[in-house]
Amino acid sequence: MLYAVFFYVRYGVSYRDLEEIMAERGVDVDHATLNRWVVKYAPQIAANAQAKKKPTASSWRMDETYIRVRGKWTYLYRAVDRDGQTLEFMLAENRDTASARRFFKRAIGTNGVPERIVIDKSGANLAGLQSINVILKFTGVGRIIGIVQSKYLNNIVEQDHRFIKRITRPMLGFKAFHSAAATLAEIETAHMIRKGQLGQQGIPAFKQFVALAG
């Protein structure tokens, strides 16, 4: 079943198409069962990937992209470093200061405090990051994050969005927020493996993915 999950989040097919692909290989799996497996393993796989990923640079690029859930747009917040290595991701129902602040706290929690973050011209992202700097200042962390607003410098993360969107497009949207978040976590993890972020060159991507499931 983990092979089906990996195939789904790595290559971008619909649940129905994956049923047919697996049936051709003699494996009987329905889309409801596959969805349960995606949701079941997502937290563990994503957490283990974060724990095992190689060190990243202290200059970040942050942006968000749109994901359709229940026929409505939600927002996938994403950050990569200057080399395009994935740092963190978070699906949110709203694109506002609170969501941006929550994302920055989460990214810092898993990657430490960066020297600077490049964002777009979004006022919500700016306000969210400024509020993080206030917290850093008054907690005595010793480093205030440099803020750069530049669409041009954010090309790295915008280009990185394309891989995620290429995988999600054939999925034709998600029916529930929690399953969307779980699926995206595994898509991001498969993307990290593809970029070699787990430092296991020579090991097949599927084996790396299965190892993260425990």
Positions of the model-derived regions?
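Residue-level recognition of single "structural anchor" positions
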Residues: 1-214
